Each structure stands twice: as C-alpha cells, then as structure tokens.
Amino acid sequence: MTSRLKTTILCVDDHWSGLISRKMLLESNGYQVLVATGGDEGLRLLLSHSVDAVVLDYQMPGMNGDVVAVKMKRAKSHVPIVLLSAYGPLPQSKLDAVDTFLSKSHPPKILLSTLQDLLNRRPRPFFSRWFNTWRSRNEGARQ
C-alpha cells in the first residue's frame, strides 16, 4: 500500500468550487495537494514539482483535459491521470492519455479508491532496480 505521507496530487479544474472541494477531500485523507485553474498552469506545476498523480477536469477554457493529459504524459509518462467530467461518457479518443475516467457525479470515496489503486500500481524505480539486481545475482545460485 502506498503511504499517503508526502504523496502529492495535482488537481486541475477551471471551476474554483470543484477544485477547493477536491483539495479539501484529498487533504483530509492525508494527501498533499497542488491546485491549478487551467491546463497551462497545471503543466507548469507538474514540471516544477514532484507529483504522484493528477486529477484533471475535462472541459476547461483554452485547452481541454484530454489535450492537457497528452502533454502531461509526454513530460512525465509515469504519473497517473484521472480525468473527470460532468458531461457523461467521453469517446475513447479523448481517453487515450489518461489512466482512468470518472464522472464528477461519482461519490468522493470512488475518487479516493481510484487514486489509491493507481498509486499502488505505479512502478517503484528504486525497488525495481534493487530487486532485478538481487534476482540476477541469485538466479545462478539456484541452478
């Protein structure tokens, strides 16, 4: 299980009320939260901070969430992205760069469990390197 201590979630939404309610939800569940009110600001924060996951609104002025997600994945492909929309299901072409799509009408616990699942699935670079080194050294001993 991923420790929420120092786990940073970036929330991007042009509606301040939704942004603040998600920030409060995530902080009350132990996450550190960065907020951005648009795609360009979200990209800047992603590039300048250590972000563990992104919660991204779909419909925003200037650049929709699907376009922002593509740019974010190009910059940091390992960071999971949850795309939110109040407008129901989106075509698959809009979801190619995101890890999960959720309707904004889902209960908050669904967002929390989705984030936890995504964070638990992430590769852990140090552990993976250590384990692969250990395994390669010990495979010869077992044969």
Predicted regions and their residues:
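Two-component/phosphorelay signaling modules centered on CheY-like receiver
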Residues: W16-L34
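Short amphipathic alpha-helix used as the core "switch/output" element in two-component signaling
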Residues: R44, D66-S77
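Helix N-cap/capping motif at the beta->alpha junctions
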Residues: V35-R44, G65
